[in-house]
Amino acid sequence: MSAQKPMISPYEVNELTKYCLNILTYTDELRSDTALKQAYEKAKELENSIRKLKIASLMENKTLICVAGMQGAGKTTLMKNFYGLKGDALSIELGRGERIPVLITETDVTAPVMNAIRIQKNEAGEYAAVECNMEANEFAHASKGEDNSILYLEMFVPYRHTYNSAVSFMLLPGFEKK
């Protein structure tokens, strides 16, 4: 019988996320000191770790159905057609689509609602993960992954297939053939 390593608990994932956000808050002051600027830049790399922790914590409360494939394979087009999305909804650049995870969740809405989960400072000057509503053009631009403060995007669509807001499709960034 092989000994299994204990899995990390959802509580520990949330605590790790809080600690990473606190580190970002504490290192923000380093930005002004040129001697410590490199330390600040390294601390900003925590944002990718925070993204992974937030997605791991999502798995505690949601079933994630991952849509993965090569760049330009049509993952975004598949989801647009699956949900009958028209116009600007999920208008992510074709061929070179999303660079950060995009969740699509059915819920009690009448039209698509687009949100970003991003790291930003609260009134106390501390970093926190905050849900922000976005317009379609902002959502498409955010999907390019140029803003490291955005952890992931989520589009809420009207009930159509799963009829379960605890199930989300997750469009993953396409991978390239080497």
Spell out what each predicted region is.
Residues 1-71, 85-166:
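N-terminal low-complexity/disordered regulatory or targeting extensions
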Residues 173-177:
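Conserved Switch II/interswitch segment of TRAFAC-class P-loop GTPases
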Residues 165-168, 178:
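Inter-motif core of Ras-like GTPase G domains
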